[in-house]
């Protein structure tokens, strides 16, 4: 408990190795076993088409979570990064947002857990779009009117992945607080609310992470360089960015062919004899 699956696997391998060396077992039970990583179908990774995104946002505007959904669509933040966003990570003068921590609710243990971003590359500073800036500025300007629960008096500690030192997350400094409870909204509650909005909008249901996928797809469609997108998403590998996060729509295929057609080759003539 408390260890990642990867760390648990390392400890298990060491345990079996030591048992074999001390003649407690005849052979390592996993000798000769090879694991293959399941191929994930592209269609299983959901994202929103432009039409579905528009329909979703029209309905979501009436939601108290609209700002959270819209900010992810504008920045590509992970859900935990959005929930753990604090005001000291926002620079209104430079119009940037810095990702340096996450926050999630552990349902099994019933507590909030602060932590570092997913990987070393996940530490990043994101330039804000005008829409993202306006969202954050409006929340900042109205922060004195929000409801606050006693939970916000807590300060959570976590280990900075870059330095190995202890850092703190001050709960009262969180950007997003549930309007009804005065506490941060739990990860799962966002998905539950999303499903209701999808049903109301008449589109297929999707989870919070699909908004991050949608951001990546819109970014490439707008002409953003893949390497730039990789940095903005906080990926260690460009392969992850392009293979897992960027989705090709029928409209983008058609647009790409039209752009190719417009670039020239006008000297190519149809040979009537060969047609």
Listing of model-derived features with the role each one plays in the protein:
Residues 1-7, 11:
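Single conserved hydrophobic/aromatic residue that forms the stacking wall/gate
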Residues 94, 105-107, 112-123, 130-132, ...:
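C-terminal secondary-structure termini that scaffold catalytic or DNA-interacting sites
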Residues 6-7, 19, 241:
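Small-residue (primarily alanine) positions within well-ordered alpha-helices
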Residues 13-16, 20, 253:
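C-terminal flanking helix
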């Amino acid at each position: 408990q408390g260890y990642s699956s990867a760390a648990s696997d390392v400890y298990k391998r060491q345990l079996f190795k030591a048992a074999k060396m001390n003649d407690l077992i005849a052979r390592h039970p996993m000798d000769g076993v090879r694991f293959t990583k399941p191929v994930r179908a592209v269609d299983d990774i959901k994202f929103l088409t432009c039409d579905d995104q528009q329909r979703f946002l029209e309905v979501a505007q009436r939601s108290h979570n609209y700002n959270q959904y819209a900010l992810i669509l504008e920045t590509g933040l992970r859900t935990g990064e959005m929930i753990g966003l604090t005001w000291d990570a926002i620079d209104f003068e430079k119009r940037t947002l810095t990702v340096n921590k996450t926050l999630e609710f552990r349902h099994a243990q019933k507590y909030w857990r602060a932590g570092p971003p997913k990987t070393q590359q996940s530490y990043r500073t994101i330039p804000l779009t005008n829409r993202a800036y306006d969202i954050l500025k409006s929340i900042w300007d109205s922060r004195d009117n929000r409801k606050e629960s006693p939970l916000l008096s807590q300060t959570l500690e976590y280990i900075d992945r870059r330095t190995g030192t202890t850092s703190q997350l001050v709960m009262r400094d969180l950007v997003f607080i549930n309007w009804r409870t005065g506490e941060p909204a739990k990860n799962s509650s966002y998905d539950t609310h999303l499903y209701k909005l999808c049903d109301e909008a008449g589109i297929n249901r999707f989870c919070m992470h699909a908004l991050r996928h949608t951001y990546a797809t819109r970014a490439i469609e707008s002409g953003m360089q893949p390497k730039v997108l990789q940095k903005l998403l906080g990926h260690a590998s460009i392969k992850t960015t392009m293979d897992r996060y960027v989705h090709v729509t029928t409209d983008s295929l058609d647009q790409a062919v039209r752009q190719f057609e417009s670039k020239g080759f006008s000297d190519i003539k149809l040979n009537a004899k060969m047609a």
